[in-house]
């Protein structure tokens, strides 16, 4: 099964963050989304990403024109790699049950 993040959400997120990759996780990635479900994106950034790009507010700004429930969570590559080994973290869920929906060429 391949899940797809809506272009109306993914395109502005990629333009705003210029990430290494974007991982769809949660119910949409598992194929269990309902009409009331949100879209969860973990946005993996370079380790030298400016701190202002790593905030919850940056995630909101990136998805500002997408008018459906969505969580856009930015994370540095090194943080993702470290936390992806810790069960119960968002990084772990994204690494083990998520689907890469964008990867920088």
Per-segment meaning from a language model:
Residues 25-27:
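Glycine-rich beta-strand-to-loop/alpha-helix junction loops that act as flexible
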């Amino acid at each position: 099964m391949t899940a797809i993040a809506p272009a109306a959400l993914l395109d502005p997120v990629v333009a705003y963050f210029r990430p290494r990759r974007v991982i769809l996780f949660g119910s949409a990635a598992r194929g269990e989304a309902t009409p009331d479900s949100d879209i969860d994106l973990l946005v993996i950034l370079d380790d030298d990403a400016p701190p202002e790009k790593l905030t919850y507010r940056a995630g909101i700004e990136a998805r500002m024109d997408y008018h459906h429930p969505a969580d856009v969570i930015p994370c540095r590559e090194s943080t993702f790699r470290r936390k992806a080994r810790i069960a119960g973290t968002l990084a772990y869920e994204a690494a083990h049950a998520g689907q890469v929906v964008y990867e920088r060429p």
